[in-house]
Amino acid sequence: VDLLHTVTEEKIDLCELRRTAPGELAGMRRTQGWVPDQYVFFAARFSEPFADVQLLGDKQAVLTFAPDVRTLTIAVGLSSVSVENARMNSLAEVPELDFDAVHARAVGQWRKALGDIVVEGGSRDEMTNFYTAQYHTKLTPNLMSDVNGEYRRHDQTVARMPEGESYYSTFSLWDTFRAWNPLQTLVDTALVNDMIRSMLDMYDSTGELPIWPLASGETGTMIGYHAVSVIADAYLKGIRGYDADKALEAMIRSSNINKKGSDYYTAQGYIPSNIKRESVSCTLEYAYDDWAIARMAQAMGRDDIFGEYARRALNYVNV
């Protein structure tokens, strides 16, 4: 077990690793990288007890099992909150260390998930292509709230979701606002409501809607502020399981926070190319997001806001 291993070159601030039961290893790691202060807690259950555990500080471990042990089944629970929650998650999802039982449940869950769109006709290859693409639409976002509802917020405090609601992260919004998010309004409205409530929680903890959130932080990656188009699309389609007044407030405030040349955009209707990179792309995407705000404000009867943002949306003509 090696807590020093990283996929990217993140800075590791803190590691903890300990034996917590005859067949359990648990710990945590805090890193600085694409997002700051990323916490991962884990609890790993093994189907066989350890014969020996050599801990190399708080960072690595060498596990030894009895000579007759040939097969191990391991269940690893994860949490952004605590080892206790990680263990709770693992026991809730994998109560028994039975690989075949877990596999059967996973097959059933994937069949249900992929069954929200049913197609008929076409060749086997075309069906394979379609359902492979459908599978890819299910890989994100990531569920961040634990089975008890707790999750780590962007301000690093721990909160709890109300019963029946879930907190999500990993919103690659610049990549998804055009197609993936509108698709979800057709096939999974419960997820759409959970995502928007999660966005509003991020707004509460940071003062701004997310741009590209990951785990318990914001990467600030890519351009635009496309959370507003996701919210407006849902609202205009009648998906409204969140505080719409608060959502509109968050959209307006986020549109006026300076990022990647948006101060020039707000002041003069475009971003000069000799001052900021990606000036045309940023101008076009800010104008689109302003149009989304205008449409939602209009639907809510906020004509004052509609007029201002309909005017801002016309900035696309400047490039």
Model-derived segments and spans:
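Secretory-pathway/luminal and periplasmic proteins that interact with or process carbohydrate-rich
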Residues: 139-145, 204-210, 259-260, 317-319
